Amino acid sequence: MSFPSLLFLGFSGVLAFGEVGWVGVYPPGRGMIRVRCVGCVVGWLGLRRVLVRGGIWLLLHPGIGRVLCLYLGAW
């Protein structure tokens, strides 16, 4: 999965602080990876983190104040 794809999922995943739910599937027609997102408020930290299953961390948009965890994999 490319970095722009992860970035898109990061922006579209959390619609409200504290939201927990299923974003959808990615990529279409390629194994249909289900993406689960968990958003929570971390204003003091000021970071958005994306956790890719396997232990890769990406820091996106310092100052936003949310943590977004994307667990990628086939459940």
Swiss-Prot record:
TM ranges: 4-26
Where is it located? Membrane
Mind listing the UniProt keywords for this protein, alphabetically? Membrane, Transmembrane, Transmembrane helix
Q: How does it sit in the membrane?
A: Single-pass membrane protein
**Might you report a single GO cellular component term?**
membrane
Superkingdom, according to UniProt? Bacteria
Name the chain's protein.
Uncharacterized protein TP_0250
Which species is this UniProt entry from? Answer: Treponema pallidum (strain Nichols)
Task: Specify the taxonomic lineage.
Answer: Bacteria, Pseudomonadati, Spirochaetota, Spirochaetia, Spirochaetales
